[in-house]
Amino acid sequence: MNNTADRFNRWEYQNIALAAIAQCASLVKTLAITGKAPQNEMIASINPLLMVDSNSVEDIYPRLSDLSLGLLTIQEIFSNDRGRKNVDIARYTLGMLLLRNKLAASQQMQDTVRQRLAGINPLEFVDETADEQAKRQLMYQDRTFEQLANLYQDTISKLSYRIQVQGKLENLKNENVANRIRTLLLGGIRSAVLWYQLGGRRWRLVFYRKRIQGTAGSIRRKLFTSA
């Protein structure tokens, strides 16, 4: 990847990637409990998987404002007051970082993931009206989620560590919800790859808690004051 644009520095881009992982984790929790999640936040979390020719972080996350949930989640996870309320989200986030490490140890699995992702187009926002075109687009979305979920099961699920998702049994057993959860986990691992490329390391999550929390807040302010 080439140097990123000048809007943010490397440390900030590293935390944007971390926010993308946390957003995937937050949406996994939401889906597991409610069976639904906002479409724009889902797309912002998943499409980085499908950006194969990217030269900058903002090529991977073209609408950084759609990562606002992840940035807010990072602020809460690293807050002494609110961190305890986000135990599942923190666990999913750390789990995706661990799975990145295990994926990095298998070149064959990396090649399989890369080859299969190359045949899948990025998701587009669908106006969920009742007309026939919207129905067809939503069916296409469902097929994409199924493809990505199958890829997760064929690869990441074979690794020695597995993320145990907590939620309502009826949602976890729902095929469409389960497909979206697996897709989000795969999307989070992709962002974990970028986080690592930008210098992210798990030990820094312990020693730089306050700085990470402050950076996430600063990025959110930059995004919404420059919009």
What are these regions (language model features)?
Residues 180-227:
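Alpha-helical oligomerization segments
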Residues 33-40, 167, 200-207:
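Structured alpha-helical bundle/scaffold domains in large eukaryotic membrane-trafficking regulators
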Residues 22-25, 29-32, 100-107, 121-124, ...:
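A structural signal for well-ordered alpha-helices, especially hydrophobic packing surfaces
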